[in-house]
Amino acid sequence: MFPASAIVLRAIRLLLAIEAGVAMIRGVGPAVFVTLAALVLTFLPALFASRVGLRLPQSFLAAIALFVLATLYLGEVHAFYDRFWWWDLALHFGSAMGFGILGFLLVFMLFQGDRYAAPPWAVGALSFCLAVTVGALWEIFEYA
């Protein structure tokens, strides 16, 4: 039996593959490109982690795939950004939380087992700064 996160990850990939095929049959070029790009993006974190030697939990991979599905597939292909005024806010909130957690883990891994221990406020500040920086870069990408 597969864990729920593995099922979610496979379901998202299957949905994107089917949608890309349907868009190809209908001749909707932009939808084909976006769904195939989203499908490729769901595989990149695991590929990157294996090359670097990290082990990412299935739940983390499923969360990334869910975010890619929400931003690219639902947001762009199904125009959720235009249909729901709060869609962009919800995705920015989710990405800020995710990048904050990622920043915390990166800083925690840097200082773990080292003789230089970072105080908790410094770890929190660096995590916050990473989340804000990535959010600012995302806004630049979004409006460019």
Question: Model-predicted segments: where are they?
Answer:
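Bulky hydrophobic segments
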Residues: 1-140, 144
